[in-house]
Amino acid sequence: MNSPYRGRFAPSPTGPLHFGSLVAAVGSYLDARTQGGEWLVRMEDVDTPRNVPGAADDILRTLDAFGFEWDGPVLYQSKRFEAYAEALDRLKQAGLLYGCACSRKEIADSATHAAIDGGLAYPGTCRGGLPAGRQARAWRLRVDAGETAFIDRLQGRVAQHLEHDVGDFVLRRADGLFAYQLAVVVDDAWQGINAVVRGADLLASTPRQIWLQRCLGYLELTYAHLPVAANPAGEKLSKQTRAQALSVDRAAAELVRALRFLGQGVPEALARGAAADVWAWAGEHWTFDAVPRQSLILLPA
């Protein structure tokens, strides 16, 4: 990486931070700080109906209470709609974007196979033009049949054939909202992010983001996808799986737990002290090579 390291943590304000969020924050923070880099915070609140009132402020208070120090102002995607619209216009002018009239039921009826992320691969129904009498509901980005690949610092080589594995994907939804894939790519470029460290639940999205970066002429980033924390049933910790909110009264203990999850040999005694002491230890001893290479780790019951 020729430019100075510039990373970020980008939670969605759909609820309080939980242990899975903390793992991603700790991993991205220490990877940046131990390389003399910057670490930014972005609120990925582009999907406005899912936002919980007060959650963004609660997330920032929790990060602060745990001792995270971010660089610059927090960026809110909900204030960036003009930038996303401009990116869409560029793609339209380049002939890379097209209107899609398909409903979910129509896609389900015509799709021939599942997408790599568990949905359905779009069969390209509207790629050659809208059916007579139909209007665009969403806007899709054209992909091709070639391979889109990258080397993840943890997960190794990752490759997808987007046309088969995903199909042309949505950048503006039928409800008028901008899709996550568009917002994250535009914001990473605008903020000068060049290193992404995040959970492996987003690994399957990365080839789409790389494709979009290329379509917009953006620089490509380096990626490291950390193992995801899962409950004993194998479900990723989330609001939907009733993950417990972090307690600021247990900051040191939770930081030690996150570091151990990430393969670091942090002394257990630090869990009974101050968060600042945990950070001091981590700043001296963080070892990226010790981070587990698997994509998911079950937490004990």
UniProtKB/Swiss-Prot annotation:
Motif interval(s): 'HIGH' region: 11-21
Output the InterPro entries linked to this UniProt entry: Glu-Q_tRNA(Asp)_Synthase, Glu/Gln-tRNA-synth, Glu/Gln-tRNA-synth_Ib_cat-dom, GluQ/Sye, Rossmann-like_a/b/a_fold
| Residues that, per the record, bind Zn(2+) | C100, C102, Y122, C126
Q: Name one GO cellular component term.
A: cytosol
GO biological process per UniProt: glutamyl-tRNA aminoacylation; tRNA modification
* Residues given in the record as ATP binding sites: K239
Place the motif 'KMSKS' region on the sequence: 236-240
Cofactor(s) essential for the protein: Zn(2+)
Is Zinc set as a keyword in this record? yes
Enzyme's top EC category: ligase
Q: Which superkingdom, per the lineage?
A: Bacteria
Q: Which Pfam families match?
A: tRNA-synt_1c (PF00749)
Binding positions for L-glutamate per the UniProt entry:
R8, F9, A10, P11, S12, E44, Y180, R198
Its Enzyme Commission number? 6.1.1.-
Q: Keywords in alphabetical order, please.
A: Aminoacyl-tRNA synthetase, ATP-binding, Ligase, Metal-binding, Nucleotide-binding, Zinc
> Per its UniProt record, what PANTHER family does this chain match?
GLUTAMATE--TRNA LIGASE (PTHR43311), GLUTAMYL-Q TRNA(ASP) SYNTHETASE (PTHR43311:SF1)
Record's function text: Catalyzes the tRNA-independent activation of glutamate in presence of ATP and the subsequent transfer of glutamate onto a tRNA(Asp). Glutamate is transferred on the 2-amino-5-(4,5-dihydroxy-2-cyclopenten-1-yl) moiety of the queuosine in the wobble position of the QUC anticodon.
UniProt protein name: Glutamyl-Q tRNA(Asp) synthetase
